[in-house]
Amino acid sequence: MTATTQADRYISFSGIDCDGNAKIVLERVVALVALPEYANCFWDRFLIRLAEADKVGARKADELCLACSNTYYIEELFEAAGDEMGLAALRRLEDECC
């Protein structure tokens, strides 16, 4: 997609890097939950599920599904951390892919 063309998932996913968008969001999540102030049981389980996302035969959800199905929790995490870049990446993921 060019900078002047708005991606519209309702027309086509062509040209939208949903896996890349999810990876950006998930990398920010992993970095934040590694900090003691954001770590908790939910994120511990989330990280286990994220590790399983790479195992095609064993996974229940891939990275995109995992990110899209937890947007509310991820948004809460980014807001608590003041992570504006994370929030922008999450918005893009939601708008283009989820």
From Swiss-Prot:
InterPro entries, A to Z: CowN
Domain of life: Bacteria
GO BP annotations, alphabetical order: nitrogen fixation
Keyword hit for ATP-binding: no
Keywords recorded for this protein, A-Z: Nitrogen fixation
Record bears the keyword Transmembrane: no
Pfam families: CowN (PF20543)
Entry similarity comment: Belongs to the CowN family.
Job description of the protein: Is required to sustain N(2)-dependent growth in the presence of low levels of carbon monoxide (CO). Probably acts by protecting the N(2) fixation ability of the nitrogenase complex, which is inactivated in the presence of CO.
NCBIfam families listed in its UniProt record: N2Fix_CO_CowN (NF033689)
Protein name, UniProt field: N(2)-fixation sustaining protein CowN
Provenance organism: Paramagnetospirillum magneticum (strain ATCC 700264 / AMB-1) (Magnetospirillum magneticum)
Lineage: Bacteria, Pseudomonadati, Pseudomonadota, Alphaproteobacteria, Rhodospirillales
Gene: cowN
